[in-house]
């Protein structure tokens, strides 16, 4: 393509060249012959800056750039306006019990409620002061009768020393306060009691005593004379409930107690004379209640 243009330019320019073999005269007018263009020269130095052109039209917005790095935390701003109340959320899990709050103000007095059920009995109170003497009471001396009496014998001879003698033959036992298995009388009612014994002896001396809670109250000694004899004793004792009374041999080898049910008996007896009046009063008060 470039060669074709070059040949065409050359033909055009050749037709316009002046003829050199023609003589120059007075009426000479030159005819130019177009030359062939040379190779491009080197670029010239940059020209001076022109004056700024008018502002162009605003271009279209560019695409959003990538997010920058997170900046440092700024200072706390001022509180904004309170927003509207949002919808009620779901119930959360039950939290730990908080500390007891301060006592609130006393509320208005409520209406009187109904009478509640009777509560359990309270503890026994302290003893009050003694009151004034009351009116004379009604005699109930014959309404309460407490009985305690016994009479027992023995069917064996020569018992062991310093042990309760077992009187195993029961003749009378009001209230069952004498125990024929142990030989002991056990007090049931506080009061004054009368005790007695009549012991037949033979072949040995006899040293016998009446014992109250481990202490001798009376002692009786009877010597063997070669014949049957009887040793006796009696006394009055104040007893408390659970006190014990029995007979025993108090000296070694002097246990001449003799028993022959078909011929002679050895007896141990006792009975209540009267009950302690304070005890009777307490029983009377319980009956009234």
From Swiss-Prot:
UniProt KW Flavoprotein keyword: no
Predominant localisation class: secreted
Residues in C1q domain copies: 143-279
Taxonomy, superkingdom: Eukaryota
GO CC aspect terms: collagen trimer; extracellular space
Keyword GTP-binding appears in the UniProt entry: no
Biased composition (Basic and acidic residues): 63-76, 93-102
Signal peptide location: 1-16
Region of interest (Disordered), ranges: 36-134
Subcellular location per the Swiss-Prot or TrEMBL entry: Secreted
Pfam families: C1q, Collagen
Residue ranges constituting the Collagen-like domain according to the UniProt record: 38-139
GO molecular-function term, one example from the UniProt record: identical protein binding
Keywords linked to the UniProt accession: Collagen, Secreted, Signal
Gene3D superfamilies: 2.60.120.40
Name listed for the protein in its UniProt record: Complement C1q tumor necrosis factor-related protein 7
Lineage of the organism: Eukaryota, Metazoa, Chordata, Craniata, Vertebrata
């Amino acid at each position: 393509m470039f060669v074709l243009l070059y040949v065409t330019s050359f033909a055009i320019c050749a037709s316009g060249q002046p003829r050199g073999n023609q003589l120059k005269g007075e009426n000479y007018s030159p005819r130019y012959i177009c030359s062939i263009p040379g190779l491009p020269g080197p670029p010239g130095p940059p020209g001076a800056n022109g004056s700024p052109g008018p502002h162009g039209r605003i271009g279209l917005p560019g695409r959003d750039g990538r997010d920058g790095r997170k900046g440092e935390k700024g200072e706390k701003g001022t509180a904004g306006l309170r927003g509207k109340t949002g919808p009620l959320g779901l119930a959360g899990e039950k939290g730990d019990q908080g500390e007891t709050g301060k006592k609130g103000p006393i509320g208005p007095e409520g209406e009187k409620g109904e009478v509640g059920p009777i509560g359990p009995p309270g503890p026994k109170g302290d003893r009050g002061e003694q009151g004034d003497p009351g009116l004379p009471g009604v005699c109930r001396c014959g309404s309460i009768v407490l009985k305690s009496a016994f009479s027992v014998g023995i069917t064996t001879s020569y018992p062991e020393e310093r042990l309760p003698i077992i009187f195993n033959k029961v003749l009378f036992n009001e209230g069952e306060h004498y125990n024929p298995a142990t030989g002991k009388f056990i007090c049931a009612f506080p009061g004054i009691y009368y005790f007695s014994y009549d012991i037949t002896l033979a072949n040995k001396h006899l040293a016998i005593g009446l014992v109250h809670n481990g202490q001798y109250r009376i002692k009786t000694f009877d010597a063997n004379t070669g014949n049957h004899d009887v040793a006796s004793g009696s006394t009055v004792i104040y007893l408390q409930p659970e006190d014990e009374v029995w007979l025993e041999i108090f000296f070694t080898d002097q246990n001449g107690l003799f028993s022959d049910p078909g011929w002679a008996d050895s007896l141990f007896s006792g009975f209540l004379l009267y009950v302690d009046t304070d005890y009777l009063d307490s029983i009377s008060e319980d009956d009234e209640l």
